[in-house]
Amino acid sequence: MLTAFTAGLLLITVSELGDKTFFIAMILAMRYPRRWVLVGVVGGLAAMTILSVLMGQIFTFLPTRYINYAEVALFLIFGTKLLWDARRIKATANLEEMEDAEKAIASGEKKLKIVPRGWGIVVESFALTFVAEWGDRTQIATIALAASNNAWGVSAGAILGHTICAVIAVMGGKFVAGRISEKTVTLIGGLLFYLFAVVSWWTKIA
C-alpha cells in the first residue's frame, strides 16, 4: 500500500524529471554558482509544495467520499493525458523544453532586474521556479493527495522528490538531459498516475 510519503515522493520524482523546471535549474546552474541556484530552486519548490498541501487541506471539510472520488478521477485524467502525450512526443521534445525554459528565464530576468550575485541568484532561482510550477499538473496532484492523505507525509515526500530532481538538474543536468527520454518518462508518469488511481479506489472506496 502506498503511504502518503511514498506517494508524494514517487509522484514528484517521476513527473519532474525533464520538465521545464528541471531545465530552468540546469540552465541557471550553468550560468551561476550551483549552491546559490540549488538553494533558490529547492526553496521555490518547497514553497509551492507547502502551498499546494495547504490548498488540499481546505477541501477536507467536504465529505470524505466525494474527496476520494475526485482524487481517483484526477489521477485517471492525468494518467490518460500523459499516456496520450507520450504517443505524440517527438524526438526533439527535450530541446523544446529547454527552449521554453530559456524563454521563461529571459522573461523573468527582465521583470525581476536582480543583480545576479549571492542572494540575488537565490531570489531569481526561487521566483522562476515558483512561477514555472504554478498550475503544473504536479501541483494539482499534490493538492489532490493532500486532500485525502496525511499532510505531513505528502509534504515530506513531495519536497524530497523535488530536492532529488533539483540536485540532479543542478549538479549534472546537461549530462542527464541528454540521456533522458521524455517519451519514456512521460509514459512512466502516466502509468504511475493510473497506479495511484487504482490504489486510491481500492483502499478508500471499494
Swiss-Prot record:
Chief localisation class: membrane
Aminoacyl-tRNA synthetase keyword on record: no
Keyword Chloroplast part of the UniProt annotation: no
Topology in the lipid bilayer: Multi-pass membrane protein
Gene Ontology biological process terms in this record: calcium ion transport
Pfam families, A to Z: GDT1
Subcellular location(s) of the protein: Cell membrane
GO molecular function per UniProt: metal ion transmembrane transporter activity
UniProt keyword annotations, A-Z: Cell membrane, Membrane, Transmembrane, Transmembrane helix
Transmembrane parts of this sequence: 36-56, 58-78, 114-134, 151-171, 185-205
Lineage: superkingdom: Bacteria
GO terms under cellular component: plasma membrane
InterPro entries recorded: GDT1-like, GDT1-like_CS
Record-stated family: Belongs to the GDT1 family.
Listed PANTHER family: TRANSMEMBRANE PROTEIN 165, TRANSMEMBRANE PROTEIN HTP-1 RELATED
Protein name, per record: GDT1-like protein sll0615
